[in-house]
Amino acid sequence: MFLRRRRVRRLTVVATLFAALAAVAAGPAGAIPDRTPSARPPLVEPIDPQRWRNPDDMTWADYRAVPGTRWADPDVEPTQRTFKGALVLLDYPDEEFTVSQPAGSTLFGNPQPSASGIPRDRLPQFYEDFLNKPGTLNNGHTINEYWMEDSGGRIGVDLTAFGVYRMPSKSYQYGVEDSMNPGACPTGDTCGKDIRADAKAAWTADAGAEETGKFDFVFYLAAGQDESSTWQEFGQMKFADRQDVPAVWGPPVPIGSGSNAAATRYVPWTSWQAAARIWPNATDGSSLQTESSGMAVYAHELSHILGIGDNYNNPYGTPLSRAYTGIWGMLSRGTFNGPGGPHTRWQIPATAGGSMGAQHVLRDKLKLGIVDEKNVLRLDRDTLKDSGLAVARVTARSAPPGEKGLAGVNITLGSDLSPSCDRKTDPLCDGGGYDNYTVEVVDRMGMDSFTPDNGVLISKTKNKDQAPFAWVIDAHPEDIDMVDFQRPDGTTQKITMGDYRQLSDALFHAGADSGSQYEYTDKANRLHFYVLDLKRDRSGVLSYTIAIRSLDGSGPQRRGVDLDRGVVRGNPSKGRATCTFDLANTGRAGNAGARLGSDVYRLSASATGRGWSAWLPNQLATAKAGTSVDVGVAVTAKSGADRHGKVVLTARSESDPRKTAKATCALRTR
């Protein structure tokens, strides 16, 4: 037995119990509880516990820098292109910039004390610096930094500010639109005016057509609040019903209904003052924002300018749909990320919710051309059944994967074989028609610092921007049961099934008893996904080993598995001991490539003997053909347990379930 095992090349992996325990530190949101020296350690200690965080509870202390990078440094040049943007400031006859006013003086309670009383002639430089120069007010984070990190240093953003230009019409004449706010235009006024046309005319008259033509894109920055960040906070969160909205929150002159409330994009009513605001948007090389629009809004709108669409739902719609990529993607509600959560997005200056958006999901990075193909493993569903399963280590998307590392995996489907479902009746229906699966890793680091969790993100994606064009597979599809806000009458409002925060616990985690899932099977599309283990390197970069297997074939490789008897370490009668087994892949890979030469094994363990218990930290293991790995089983003995016990470990090949092995670990109390 020993001699035969020596012919098998050994491999050290994090699947061992001790390395896995060290990997618990991979979760920045939590750590192993403190113990007194006399405390008996628990048998169950998950290697990758899910401890998701509510964005409402986050602060700037949650930000973690990406090791070895300095994307916010203006001296770091992008490797491909710097996009030159004009930042054009606009105000109105009835509204000047909020940050020029005394702290807390506006109807909305802005500006915050951090920025107030700024003279009008200093506003262009103030906002140019706030958005794109690292400083105290923006906590050292910029739009340029976002795109440098998101693209791995490929593209950057440079801004030049102009203005302030006084618009010829009042603020609400631009903000009230028939599509979102029907019937909300004050009597005698004309609404739905084209602020871009008026802004471009004013800017061109000042700077000249030659100057305005030098830029790749234009950010129009208008004074005041935006509707997206105020409709809920200054609507149903503040007033019990539309009849309760007082005149101070109503129009300056009556609207046709005589109400102080007005319709808004997602719900039937909000206060008129909230509804009369501009909703940020992008078209034809320019985007429109306001003072309450955080840095993430600019990153979101620039994505549109670069040629990619929205991927979000109406969380209050009829029929109701689950969020698409939600909190995990810039083109979904990841735009809302930032300390304090979505209900702080009304604040000016915008340093809370909406100030640091999530990275783009892998599908969107591929479309934007901001991830290197050499760092993406391309697989095909039909090819997998002939090649056998693929095993790969994927680096967290916020960190550079290096020359040979992977930023993610894309599996081409050819066609989506999922059974049809009805989005009109089923909120969890993805609508079908997907072209791919993607697998990537999220860590709460860099621009993903204000996502709620670290783990593996699995998504179905489409090649065309036909929303939903990316759909996250939710490890917890059930209602997350999260409080949204307290209504004015004191009752609690939970988030809807369509709210993006339903996906806060969507990530997959490695190991047993994590609180999440470590595998996902799409029977219709004949694919099985595994999360095998995790590792955080010395610098702090997180990665996961994942595998994808076809349900229709295991490839030409000869499969095999063998186990050596276990070796116990520690005293099970005084606490938690470990039985370590040597698991060998005795198969042959043949001519399979580096990522196709492994197998995945499903493990089970049982203890015999009165008072003895066993627990597997990881019920999956992987090894390349011709190599072996250690598998740890945690064991403990209660007081009064039999003097002798036994743990039996069973390993079964996922590629060929006929290939199994068993081994025993002999135990005794001391």
Where are these regions (language model features)?
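Secretory targeting and sorting signals
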Residues: 2-31
